[in-house]
A protein has these predicted regions:
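Cleft-lining beta-strand/loop regions that shape enzyme active-site pockets
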Residues: 215, 316, 321-322, 326-513, ...
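Conserved small/polar residues in nucleotide/adenosyl-binding loops
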Residues: 578-585
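A flexible loop/linker signature enriched in serine peptidases of the S9 family
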Residues: 1-80, 126-133, 171-175, 194-197
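Multi-bladed beta-propeller domains
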Residues: 32-58, 90-108, 139-153, 182-197
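Interdomain regulatory linker/hinge segments that flank or connect interaction modules
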Residues: 231-278, 336, 345-351, 359-370
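PDZ/PDZ-like domain segments forming the peptide/carboxylate-binding groove
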Residues: 273-325, 400, 523
Length: 589
């Protein structure tokens, strides 16, 4: 930007960072290549205007001298075309770090940023409330204003070469804005394309081949002759005429690499029927009419003060339609998510019948409610088995939301517990191994005391007491790496079942046909001995399986084993410490 005298970039230097390893608020910055450009940028509005007048006068004087000289030249010389000399960019690396300027007045979730050719105006896309909006900042006056409320889920923009128009691409629209009028106008278009789908699939197959060849984390492709393997699978292409089969072909093809985080996926853009749920659990041994309620799920549609629904009640009708043993009640909830629905109920104990209007939820919402129920049950079991001595946290995924929940619980309601059971089972990954390592590897070095009263132990933002981690066969990706780091750093023991070696980082790429996606494992995690965590199974210190027979009874054998082991460790350390203190006392008697 600024004719090559500065570089515009976005950084998280001043922004708030997420608890977890990624995610932050950003700022737009400029770094100036030379002192002259930096000095001009910092001029006040008045000084800048004076500077422009001075430069204008100097330019006029120079041109006048040139014109006087031309009068004496002959006609032939006056008609010669003079090549315009490209102005050199002066780059002064000395003290360049002192010529970095923060442009945005505050950090935010940024989408894109552009500075005008004269360096006077900054346009940027930022999300403060909801989606991305277009903001404008006068860099000389330091004046910022919201230019257009767009509320876009994602957005990007480019300026034309003359600097007269901004082109904005949002979630579902393309728009144009003249920098003089600053009014947004939609860009409408209509196009027809005739696709050779077989040729497109051939192109996409070649693209997958090249991308894996150039970006796969392991240089020898896990020992696979990639060209030969590609040739072997290419012969199936002429026989494929749909994306279902093409995605399956990609999965088989990429599966030859014997690696996680890859394969082809087809995401058909179809809107099918969606069955809602009432947020209830039922007794399937009930043979009569209606649905016998066995549990009202917490925070579900019926879990509110005005509802009389409880376990033991029977749902007789939904929107006036009777439920019989022969009928499928789910049909009555088709398309009812977030819509008011009339439910007729019966209490066998009091013989009372009544109706309630409820708003059913989607299966996705119900899944979240059942997850919260599962975690609450595990926490209650740990509390019961340890007699209130241990706390329990479950890391749902290796991301910021889960980390915040864990952080809040261990340093909040469980702060005074003697130990923590960390459950990673069924975690699909993300990136938290460093954060979990730091959080649970605290070692107390002193205590803050205020007028004789202990305030807190230090470090105060880490767990300084014993812990244990539970894992299972369903752990994946960073949920393999996190227990590995936890064990390798000797923070605590692992309890449960072996975890498949799936610790790589992936780049999921959408193909030219946006219904198709494939994965490239681009980062491997290598150990000092040269081996990788990928394909290296992680064994627990204490191997315990949850059998189907115990799971259906609501019993968690793995969790019970973890509680017993952690209590044994804590009690063992307590006995050892008491013995050590007694021995030290004997020395001074």
């Amino acid at each position: 930007v600024l004719d090559g005298n500065a570089i515009l970039f976005i950084t998280e230097r001043y922004g708030m960072r997420a608890h977890a390893s990624w995610g932050s608020l950003n700022d737009v910055m400029l770094v100036f290549m030379n002192q002259d450009a930096y000095d001009k940028f910092r001029l006040s509005k008045e000084d800048y205007e004076l500077q422009k007048e001075l430069e204008k006068e100097q330019k006029n004087t120079t041109e006048a001298k040139k014109n006087d000289k031309k009068k004496g030249d002959n006609k032939e010389k006056s008609e010669e075309k003079k090549e315009e000399k490209v102005k050199d960019i002066v780059v002064e690396l000395n003290n360049i770090e002192d010529r970095i300027v923060r442009l945005t007045p505050n950090s935010s979730d940024l989408g894109s940023a552009i500075i005008t050719k004269d360096g006077e105006t900054l346009y940027y896309l930022s999300a403060f409330e909801g989606g991305y909006d277009l903001w404008k900042m006068n860099l000389r006056k330091k004046d910022t204003k919201l230019l257009h409320k767009m509320d876009a889920g994602w957005a990007n923009m480019e300026m034309d070469k003359d600097g007269k128009n901004l082109f904005l691409l949002g979630s579902n629209t393309m728009q144009k804005m003249g920098t003089d009028s600053e009014s947004l106008k939609p860009i409408s278009y209509q196009a027809h394309v005739k696709m050779d789908l077989a040729a497109e699939r051939d192109y996409m197959f070649n693209h997958v081949y090249k991308q894996e060849q150039k970006r796969f984390y392991n240089l020898n492709m896990h020992g696979i002759d990639w060209d030969a393997m590609t040739k072997a699978y290419r012969k199936f292409l002429p026989h494929i005429d749909n994306n279902y089969d093409f995605a399956e072909l990609l999965s088989e093809y990429l599966g030859e690499l014997n690696v996680s985080h890859t394969g082809g996926r087809f995401r058909p853009q179809l809107k099918g029927d969606a069955t809602a749920t009432l947020g209830l659990l039922y007794d399937w041994n009930h043979n009569g009419k209606g649905l016998l309620i066995s549990e009202v799920v917490e925070k579900g549609p019926f879990d509110h003060a005005r509802s009389k629904v409880k376990a033991g009640n029977i749902i007789e009708k939904i929107d006036g339609q009777e439920i019989t043993p022969e009928s499928d009640y789910s049909v009555l909830l088709n398309g009812k998510a977030r819509k008011k629905t009339l439910v007729t109920l019966y209490n066998p104990q009091t013989k009372e019948r009544w109706e309630e209007v409820v708003v059913p939820v989607s299966n996705g919402v119900m899944s979240d409610l059942l997850y919260a129920r599962w975690v609450k049950q595990r926490a209650a079991d740990v509390d019961k088995w340890s007699n209130g001595r241990l706390g329990y946290v479950h890391i749902e995924s290796m991301g910021d939301d889960s980390f915040r929940s864990v952080y809040s619980d261990i340093l909040g309601k469980y702060n005074n517990r003697e130990g923590i059971v960390i459950d990673t089972r069924f975690n699909g990954g993300g990136r938290l191994h460093e954060d979990i390592e730091i959080l649970f590897s605290g070692k107390k070095y002193f205590t803050q005391v205020v007028r004789g009263r202990e305030a807190c132990d230090m470090p105060s933002r880490r767990w300084n007491k014993p812990s244990i981690m539970v894992q299972c066969e369903a752990n994946y990706s960073n949920a393999h790496g996190t227990p590995w780091v936890y064990s390798h750093q000797k923070i605590g023991k692992l309890v449960g079942m072996p975890v498949p070696g799936t610790m790589t980082s992936v780049s999921w790429e959408t193909l030219q046909d946006p219904t198709l996606v494939f994965g490239i494992p681009v980062i491997g995690y290598r150990l000092p001995d040269g081996s990788y965590l990928e394909n290296s199974q992680l064994e627990p210190d204490i191997k315990v399986a949850n059998s189907p027979e115990t799971v259906v009874k609501g019993e968690d054998t793995q969790l019970k084993a973890a509680v017993d082991e952690l209590l044994k460790e804590i009690d063992g350390k307590s006995v050892s410490y008491t013995h050590l203190r007694a021995h030290e006392t004997d020395q001074y008697l």
